[in-house]
């Protein structure tokens, strides 16, 4: 079974998806991390990006200047769109290939995808889990984790579906507004439920 975990910025996707992978003895993929790997010199994302932008976002050593690119993504929708046009198909293919590997090794796969519904990849997955925390709590956790300003956080959130919309699509919701222990308990329940679904051979309808 392949399971997608999504949510808002800082809602706890990483925390919840890693716990769920442990609960199900599943493999885990983080699509943000796949994007970052694609943008390393020598990889296809970096090559395609360099063809479009030349050395505009490179440091003297030839590596990507992440700070410069991050600023451009915030302020220039042309750069953001082009980056997504390059990276999304590459990452989607990587996830599909890894799922094939999991099918062969008979493992489940948990994939963390911030923009699952926005990019329309939900039908690649059997189960859609949304991790929820109220907006104010997201903001304070992201500010503590990344040092982002409120304005930067708002700009990122403005490009995403509101969490309330994501919740409407969810097969399962994890409420991560409490303690880590509360989240662990919900994940333990979810893992058990999904394992039961698998053993009953449930074919979930994702349409
Ligand atoms: P996302 O992957 O959605 O951006 P993370 O899982 O990285 O979110 O969580 C954002 C921040 O909030 C991290 O610093 C994480 O350690 C913290 N965090 C996550 N869940 C909880 C929780 N239940 N209680 C307190 N802090 C949490």
Where are these regions (language model features)?
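ATP-dependent NMP and nucleoside kinases share a basic, alpha-helical "lid"
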Residues: 94-104, 108-144
């Amino acid at each position: 079974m392949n399971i997608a975990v999504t949510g808002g910025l800082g809602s706890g996707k990483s925390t919840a998806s890693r716990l769920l992978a442990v609960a199900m003895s599943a493999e885990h993929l983080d699509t943000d991390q796949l994007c970052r790997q694609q943008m390393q010199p020598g990889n296809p994302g970096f090559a395609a990006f360099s063809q479009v932008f030349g050395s505009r976002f490179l440091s003297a050593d030839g590596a990507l200047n992440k700070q410069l690119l991050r600023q451009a993504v915030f302020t220039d929708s042309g750069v953001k769109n082009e980056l997504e046009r390059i990276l999304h198909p590459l990452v989607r293919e990587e996830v599909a290939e890894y799922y094939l590997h999991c099918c062969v090794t008979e493992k489940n796969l948990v994939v963390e995808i911030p923009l699952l519904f926005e990019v329309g990849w939900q039908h690649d997955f059997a189960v859609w889990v949304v991790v929820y925390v109220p907006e104010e709590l997201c903001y304070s956790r992201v500010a503590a984790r990344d040092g982002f300003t409120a304005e930067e956080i708002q700009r990122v959130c403005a490009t995403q579906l509101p969490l309330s919309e994501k919740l409407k699509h969810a097969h399962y919701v994890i409420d991560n507004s409490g303690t880590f222990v509360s989240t662990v308990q919900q994940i333990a329940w979810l893992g058990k439920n999904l394992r039961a679904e698998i053993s009953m051979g449930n074919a979930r309808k994702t349409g």
